[in-house]
A protein has these predicted regions:
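Sec-dependent N-terminal signal peptides of Gram-positive bacterial secreted proteins and lipoproteins
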Residues: 2-20
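A domain-start/cap signature at the N-terminus of enzymes
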Residues: 17-100, 183, 251, 255-258, ...
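Gly/Ser-rich "nucleophile elbow"/oxyanion-hole loop immediately N-terminal to the catalytic nucleophile
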Residues: 93-98, 147-179
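Active-site machinery of serine-nucleophile hydrolases
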Residues: 100-102, 106-156
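Short alpha-helix in the alpha/beta-hydrolase fold that links the catalytic acid
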Residues: 118, 231-249
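Short, proline-enriched alpha-helix->beta-strand connector loops that line the catalytic pocket
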Residues: 135, 214-220
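Primarily recognizes the serine-hydrolase "nucleophile elbow" in alpha/beta-hydrolase
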Residues: 164-165, 171-215
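C-terminal catalytic histidine-bearing segment of alpha/beta-hydrolase fold enzymes
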Residues: 223, 227-229, 248-307
Length: 307
């Protein structure tokens, strides 16, 4: 019995969350998802059969269901990393003749694969709100197992797979991570920052180093509640300062630094005005923040751009 108890404590430590926090955060994130979702109806279509596609860089089994135009639970089978589960939306207009943008969104705890296939896009709105900023864009929503090194490697492998097998504009490859997904994102940017054009870190902390991302000069936007219940805002402040100081030491101008790293601390009123009591769970609201999402995609919000 003691051995089992110790194992449970160990597993919780790996996730970085206490049982009480996990329960509370999941509840709050569900509330936020309901608050920001403009489409509460579940669209579920079962195709007649699934099929496998052999592509360069891995074997893909395409998902057999859809949710709000996303194919749910496709799998990239990697010999080195194992199965990489993801949901994907490829616009009907894509025929390979024109380069498209690529957007990857990494979920929080509630969106990990063990929670259920497709739960990431059912509980977060980033993948759907992004469509209002870029019309010709492939959107990939990985379902990872945690927010450690293996998940970072899987994210990189999935990114490289789409870059190899689809006609992607290499100047328009965007990525965001919310909560635990932000921790994964920081490790991704520590390993292969040059794959991405811009990165958005939401309600999280930076687990990676800073050398690679500053050498590659990949713009990063940090956004979090001032009193985030899980992380607090200090880790983002520290990460921002570390990146800022590196650029300053290189002699980069203040104007240019402001384009490369942004710190956006939201006050309590930001969440209260939107009917959300939890600042951490309320991080889901950032998906509908036109300043935040507009920065990521370098464009203005447009209702007409939504597919």
């Amino acid at each position: 019995m003691l051995e089992k108890a110790m194992m449970l404590i160990f597993m919780l430590a790996l996730t970085g969350c206490s049982p009480e926090y996990i329960s509370e955060a999941a509840a709050n994130e569900t509330v936020v998802s309901e608050a920001v979702s403009s489409n509460t109806d579940t669209q579920k279509i079962v195709f007649e059969s699934s099929y496998d596609v052999q592509e360069t860089g891995g074997f893909v089994t395409e998902g057999t269901e859809t949710y709000r135009d996303f194919i749910v639970d496709s799998v990239l089978h990697s010999e080195e990393l194992g199965d990489i589960h993801y949901c994907v939306k490829i616009p009907d207009s894509y025929d390979g003749s024109t380069p498209y943008s690529l957007y990857i969104t990494l979920p929080g705890y509630e969106g990990l694969y063990f929670q259920g296939a497709g739960i990431n896009i059912r509980s977060e709105e980033f993948a759907f709100e992004a469509q209002k900023y870029k019309e010709n864009m492939i959107i990939v929503a990985p379902q990872l197992d945690d927010w450690g090194e293996l998940s970072a490697d899987k994210t990189i492998a999935l990114t490289e797979f789409f870059l190899r097998n689809y006609n992607i504009d290499r100047e328009q490859v965007y990525i965001n991570g919310y909560s635990g997904g932000g921790e994964t994102l920081s490790l991704v940017l520590d390993k292969r920052p040059e794959l991405y054009t811009r990165a958005l870190m939401c309600s999280s902390q930076w687990d990676g180093d800073y050398e690679a991302v500053t050498e590659a000069k990949i713009p990063v936007y940090f956004v979090i509640g001032e009193s985030d219940e899980y992380y607090g805002s200090e880790p983002f402040k520290e990460a921002y300062e570390a990146i800022y100081n590196r650029y300053k030491a290189e002699g980069i101008s203040e104007e240019e630094i402001q384009k490369l790293v942004v710190l956006d601390i939201k006050p309590a009123s930001y969440f209260e005005d939107r009917g959300v009591t939890s600042q951490h769970g309320g991080g889901g609201l950032f998906s509908r923040d036109e300043t935040v999402m507009g920065w990521l995609f370098g464009t203005e919000y447009s209702e007409q751009a939504e597919n």
